[in-house]
Amino acid sequence: MGIQISLPMMAFLVFMTGFAGFVDSAAGGGGLISLPAYLFAGLPPHYTYATNKFSAACGTTFATASFFKNGAMNLKVGILAAIGSFAGSALGAHIVLMLSDEVLQMMMFIILPIAAVVILWRRNLPDENRDDGTLNLKKALLALGIGFGIGLYDGMVGPGTGTFAIIAFTSLMGFDLRTANGNAKVLNLASNYASLFTYLSSGLVVFPVGIPCAISNIVGNIIGSHFALRKGAKFIRPMMLVVLVLLLGKLVSDAVL
């Protein structure tokens, strides 16, 4: 499919995907910025999903490396969650390929209000680490379950995935915000690549658009992860509220337009 993007629109996309990478690395939810941007630029929904996954996967790779380098994650839990996330996201992406553009848009409109309520309800997350450092069968299954559920959501819908992962790791597993964010990065990385492999095999990634956006997303992720690691909860909490505002804004725009 030949997709033409004007130079000013390409510049807009590069800026927006860079900002999306910044937000995503700090608190998740970068897709709330990048997905509407791709759609606004004129990419059809399936191509938007695929190209967004390409740029997001590239950026998340660098953010995950930053959190790993700084020891801001529980690697065992993160890997288990990533395994579940990879399976869930691959399944979700295959389901998306079977749906029409109209169904995808309707699905977003139904699911995003629920997502907004969840984020608003859990906006005041604890910052103390209540995890005892052990990994038993219950925790392992919980990590796999969190990964699969959020991965399925990411493969089918996407926006807010990192934020939901942070909420799950703090609320259900007792991690502080910094560690939960690191675990979320590992989960999200696996989810992004699982979906991306599915979209690549279907030829849906628009590389002339995706490559410059991926570079911008990488830069945004590097800067955002730097701030999140240095500032911790003081930076992550406000960014999560920014994600909530963006999510609610998207809901309003979908309802009006």
Which role does the model predict for each range below?
Residues M1-P44, R130-N181:
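Selected transmembrane alpha-helices and immediately adjacent juxtamembrane segments
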Residues M10, K53, M108-L112, A116, ...:
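Residues within membrane-spanning alpha-helices of integral membrane proteins
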Residues V14, G18, F22, K53, ...:
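Residue-level signature of the transmembrane alpha-helical core
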Residues F40, A93, L97, M106, ...:
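Transmembrane helix-loop junction
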Residues H46-A50, N181-K185:
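Small-residue hotspots at the loop-to-helix junctions and early N-terminal turns
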Residues A50-V103, M107-I110, N192-V242:
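Selective hydrophobic functional segments
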Residues F62-A72, F109-L135, L248-L257:
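Transmembrane helix exit motif
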Residues G147-V157, S195-G203, G210, L247-L257:
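Hydrophobic alpha-helical transmembrane segments in multi-pass integral membrane proteins
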